[in-house]
Amino acid sequence: VTSDKAVCGTDPAPARLTVGIVSAGRVGSALGAALERAGHVVFGVSGISDASVYRARTRLPDSEILPAEEVARRAELLLLAVPDSELAGLVSGLATADAVRPGTIVAHTSGANGIGVLAPLTARGALPLAIHPAMTFTGHDEDVSRLGNACFGITAADDIGYAIAQSLVIEMGGEPVRVAEEHRTLYHAALAHGSNHLVTLILDAVEALRAALAGPGLLGQQLVDDQPGGLAERVLAPLASAALDNALRRGPSALTGPVARGDVDAVAAHLNALESTDAELAAGYRALSLRTAQRARTNPALLELLASPSDRRDAAEGSDQAKEGN
C-alpha cells in the first residue's frame, strides 16, 4: 500500500507493495525476485507456457499462479512483463475487463514503449510507469544478480511517478535513468544495436575463427568443434572483451586495426578470405568496416572499396552527370 505521505506528494517513495506480475517470463520472474528481496510481496503471477510456470515456481515459490485479470485486480503494483508485440493488446483487455483499480501502479518493462501504451488504464485511474532494465535475460540464476549492474530506462507522467519508478529501481539494485516519452524508440534501438548485433558480430567472428583454426593443432591443443565455449571463443574472448572495455571507456580513440589505419590491401585480403568461407559473413564484415571507416574518417580509397556495388554505381552516375553538366 502506498503511504499517506505519498498521496500528499511529500514522500512519493512506495511502501511495501502487493505485487502482481503478468507474466512470469525471464524478465518478469527476475524482477519479481528482486522486488521480493526488497521486501515487497509478489502474491501472484500469470504464466501460460510450461517454461513460465516453472520459472514462477522456482523463482517465486510463494506466489500463486493466476489468470492475468485476477492478478491485475488484486495488485497494488502491477508489472506487465510481456513481449512488446503483446503489450497493447494486454492493456486493452485489462481495461475492457475493468480489471485494474484506480490508484494501482501499473509498470511495463518494454524498452520501445513509454507510458502512452498504458493510456487505457491511465484513463481508469492507474499510475503509469515504464521501467525497462537495460539487460539481457537468459532465464538462468545470474539474471537477478545482474540487475545490480543494470541501468533502467524509466518514463512516467509526472514527478510523483518518476520518484516511485526511481525508488523501485533502486530497491531492485539498479540505476534509474530518465528517458523522455518521445525518445523511447530511439533508446530501444540504440540498446538493440549495441547488444543484439554484438552477439551476431561475435558469432560471425567465431565462425571465421573455427574455419581458420581447423586442421592439425599443437600437441594437447583442444580440437575445433561447433560447441560454444571452445577454442575459437577462447582465442577471441580477451581481444573482444578489451575492445568493448576500450570503446566504453575511451570512445573513438579505441578504434584500431586495418580499417582505422586505412590499409586497403589488408581489408581487401580480409574480404577475399571471408568470401571463400561465407558470403553472408563477408557482407557483414564489409558493412561494419564501412561504418568503421566512416567513423575513422580514413583513406578515401578504402571507402570506395567498401561501398556496395549500388553505391559505387550511383557515385559513378553522379560523376558522369556532373561531367555532362560541365
Stretches found by the model and what they are:
Residues 18, 40-44, 75-78, 102-106, ...:
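Short active-site oxyanion
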Residues 1-73:
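NAD(P)+-binding Rossmann beta1-loop-alpha1 motif at the extreme N-terminus of oxidoreductases
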Residues 50, 54, 58-60, 64-142:
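Rossmann-like NAD(P)(H) cofactor-binding subdomain of soluble oxidoreductases
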Residues 38, 56-59, 121, 142-246:
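Internal alpha-helical scaffold of NAD(P)-dependent oxidoreductase catalytic cores
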Residues 2, 13, 234-326:
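NAD(P)-dependent Rossmann-like dehydrogenase/reductase catalytic/cofactor-binding core
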Residues 2-14, 97, 211-230, 312-326:
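Intrinsically disordered, low-complexity terminal tails and inter-domain linkers enriched
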Residues 29, 33, 37, 58, ...:
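Short, well-ordered alpha-helices that flank and scaffold nucleotide-derived cofactor binding pockets
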